[in-house]
Amino acid sequence: MINEILDKVVRLLEEVRAKKPLVHSITNYITATDCANVILAVGGSPTMADYVKEVEEIASISSAVVLNMGVISDGMVESMILAGKSANKNNVPVIFDPVGAGVANFRNESAEKILSEVKIDIIRGNISEIKFICGLSSETKGVDASESDMNMGNDKKAIVAQELAKKLNCVVAITGVDDIISDGKRNVILSNGHKMLANVTGTGCMSSALCGAFAGASNDYFIAAICAILTMGISGEIAYEKSKGIGMGTFHTSLIDAISMMNENIIKEKAKVTTINR
């Protein structure tokens, strides 16, 4: 099964470069540039429009829509819901990144409102955010997962991912030291990445943007999420090796470089994928 998954990941890497999907990303001003750059790096075409009077139209002609709650406001929530509904109407996949869910009441209410009005195809977050969305008690550290949540075993995280995937009828990606991806039936653990990724603002947001790029070129959103998270994790490892002893700026640049150079040989040499039978 793992070889089959990796074959599909490799094909999708090629397809996204051939199709150049338009990815409509409503994200935050902290990470917008990096999100746009990683979409470009894998072969997609980003648009970052968030004005309420144009998001419906742009979402309707896009290949994927990414909704990111990094910086939230009444106007941003309205734009996200309008874009999401337009995407649903036009069979465009929607990726949701509930940044900081569980931190504050307005953010929590916003996440719940988006989920109640928009059909989500992929939801990506850390374990604390996903536990909150799943209706479980969770602790957060700003927009980061709490230490107690991060210390949950992979088996328990997989149960959370699978249950939420069934509940929302979508793909769930929990990212962390190990990444858990589930569509409610298929479940995998991805063990790539490097701790330096946590020291760069927005690598989670970039992962969600990559989910949009790959979902925009595929009907299998489980494989799209795997492709996105593997690309980020492996690129983090490569970037660390290239920037070791130099500094964070070089790591950041090397990360984008590695994403842009991802290919079949790198995937098949470095991917660490484990299936979970549940």
UniProtKB/Swiss-Prot annotation:
Catalytic activity: 5-(2-hydroxyethyl)-4-methylthiazole + ATP = 4-methyl-5-(2-phosphooxyethyl)-thiazole + ADP + H(+)
Keyword field: ATP-binding, Kinase, Magnesium, Metal-binding, Nucleotide-binding, Thiamine biosynthesis, Transferase
Cofactor(s) needed for function: Mg(2+)
EC number: 2.7.1.50
Top-level taxon of the source organism: Bacteria
Binding site for ATP: R124, T175
Record pathway: Cofactor biosynthesis; thiamine diphosphate biosynthesis; 4-methyl-5-(2-phosphoethyl)-thiazole from 5-(2-hydroxyethyl)-4-methylthiazole: step 1/1
SUPFAM superfamilies, sorted: Ribokinase-like (SSF53613)
GO biological process: thiamine biosynthetic process; thiamine diphosphate biosynthetic process
Any one GO molecular function term: ATP binding
Binding annotation for substrate: M48, G202
Pfam families per record: HK (PF02110)
Function: Catalyzes the phosphorylation of the hydroxyl group of 4-methyl-5-beta-hydroxyethylthiazole (THZ).
HAMAP family, sorted: Thz_kinase (MF_00228)
Annotated NCBIfam families: PRK09355.1 (NF006830), thiM (TIGR00694)
Family: Belongs to the Thz kinase family.
Name the UniProt record assigns to this protein: Hydroxyethylthiazole kinase
Gene: thiM
